[in-house]
From Swiss-Prot:
Reaction catalysed by this enzyme: Cleavage of hydrophobic, N-terminal signal or leader sequences from secreted and periplasmic proteins
Homology family: Belongs to the peptidase S26 family.
A GO CC annotation given for this chain: plasma membrane
Gene Ontology BP term (one): signal peptide processing
Top-level division of the source organism's lineage: Bacteria
Name by which UniProt lists this protein: Signal peptidase I P
Major localization listed first in the record, in broad terms: membrane
Transmembrane segments: 15-34
Length: 185
C-alpha cells in the first residue's frame, strides 16, 4: 500500500515536471524564436490579406540579419499595435521613388512582389506609388512600405522611420487560413 502511494505521488511529480518544462519551452520559443501574429488591414494586399495569421521569426532580431524586401512585423506606439510591412530601406540607404520605380542608393530596385498591383494601377492609367525622395535613412533606422501602396500608412505618410528595437521579426510562414499556407514573398 505504501509503495502504491509512493508511486502515485512520484507519477504526479513527474507530470508536474513535464508540464513545467513544456511551459518553459513554449515561453522560450515565443520570446526568442517564433510568435504568431494576425494581419490587420489591407496594406499588404495582394501579398497578405486581412485576418491571415503568420509566424514571425524573432531570432533575426538578435542576429540583425534583415534584408531589403523582407516582410517584417513592427511594434507601434507603446507596443499596443503591430504593423506588417515590407522592409525597403536599411540604415544609410537613400530611397527614392520616380515614375513608379523604386531606387535604392541610386540603383533601380526590382519589386517583383508588386507585379500584380502595378499592372492594376497602370491599367487604370495610375502610378502605384507617388514620387518621393530622395530620403536618406539615418543610422539605426528602417524605412518600410506596404505592398498596397495606394492604401498603406507607412514610412512615407504617417508612421515614419522605425528603430531596430521596433522590429519584432521577419515573416516566416502564413499558417492560416489552412488553404493558403505559404511563405509570403
Amino acid at each position: 500500500m505504501f509503495d502504491k502511494e509512493k508511486r502515485k505521488k512520484s507519477n504526479i511529480i513527474d507530470w508536474i515536471k513535464a508540464i513545467l518544462i513544456a511551459l518553459i519551452l513554449v515561453f522560450l520559443v515565443r520570446t526568442f524564436l517564433f510568435e504568431p501574429y494576425i494581419v490587420q488591414g489591407e496594406s499588404m494586399k495582394p501579398t497578405l490579406f486581412n485576418s491571415e495569421r503568420l509566424f514571425v521569426n524573432k531570432f533575426v532580431k538578435y542576429t540583425g540579419d534583415f534584408k531589403r524586401g523582407d516582410i517584417v512585423v513592427l511594434n507601434g506606439e507603446e507596443k499596443k499595435t503591430h504593423y506588417v510591412k515590407r522592409l525597403i530601406g536599411l540604415p544609410g540607404d537613400t530611397i527614392e521613388m520616380k515614375n513608379d520605380n523604386l531606387f535604392v542608393n541610386g540603383k533601380r530596385f526590382n519589386e517583383e512582389y508588386l507585379k500584380e498591383n502595378k499592372k492594376d494601377a497602370h491599367d487604370s492609367d495610375l502610378n502605384l506609388t507617388g514620387d518621393f525622395g530622395p530620403i536618406k535613412v539615418p543610422k539605426d533606422k528602417y524605412f518600410v512600405m506596404g505592398d498596397n501602396r495606394q492604401n498603406s500608412m507607412d514610412s512615407r505618410n504617417g508612421l515614419g522611420l522605425f528603430n531596430k528595437k521596433d522590429i519584432v521579426g521577419v515573416e516566416e510562414l502564413v499558417f492560416f487560413p489552412l488553404d493558403r499556407i505559404r511563405h509570403a514573398k
